[in-house]
């Protein structure tokens, strides 16, 4: 039977220690988030003991370093599957997981502002593109501050034709939408606050 390992509130050093400890034992990162102040970022992760394609991960890197890691991974045939970020837009730090073996189409962006559906490079435009072109969010995150929110996302081809929707709303409205959709046999797939 596969084992799961999870932790939260881990420092970058503790997260790296767990990475070195769990990876050789056959565990894979299946969830990863970074939060808090960039000078003392905290990590939460879920590790699943199971086989799968080759994978790699990065954490504690700035936007330029993330872009380099992303470009290198894509050149090597890895697709992004998890992204998380914390901190102000201009000095955020990122954590991400990349995996080989994703033969269907995907796209990813970070540093997006909210914007309108016709505003190239905005989060709303990316979500509309995904919906219109048959993609589904694989991983989404919000970072920045209330006056300058930024978004990062990874979208993969929706090969299973899974119905999906997305909301950027206050908690009371979200709860009403959640209750209605759960009543219709849907479940949350991605949530970020």
Regions found by a protein language model. Give the residues of each.
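Terminus-proximal functional modules
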Residues: 1-193
């Amino acid at each position: 039977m596969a084992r799961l390992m999870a932790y939260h509130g881990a420092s970058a050093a503790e997260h790296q220690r767990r990475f070195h400890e769990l990876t050789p034992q056959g565990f894979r990162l299946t969830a990863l988030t970074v939060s808090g102040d960039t000078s003392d970022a905290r990590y939460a992760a879920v590790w699943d003991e199971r086989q799968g394609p080759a994978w790699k991960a990065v954490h504690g890197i700035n936007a330029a370093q993330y872009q380099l890691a992303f470009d290198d991974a894509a050149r090597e045939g890895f697709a992004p599957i998890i992204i998380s970020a914390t901190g102000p837009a201009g000095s955020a730090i990122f954590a991400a997981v990349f995996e080989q073996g994703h033969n269907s189409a995907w796209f990813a962006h970070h540093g997006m502002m909210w914007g309108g559906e016709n505003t190239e490079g905005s989060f709303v435009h990316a979500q509309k593109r995904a919906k219109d072109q048959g993609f589904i969010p694989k991983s989404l995150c919000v970072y920045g501050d209330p006056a300058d929110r930024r978004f990062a996302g990874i979208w993969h081809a929706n090969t299973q034709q899974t119905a999906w929707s997305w909301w950027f709303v206050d908690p009371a409205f979200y709860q009403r939408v959640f209750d209605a959709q759960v009543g219709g046999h849907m479940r949350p797939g991605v949530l970020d606050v």
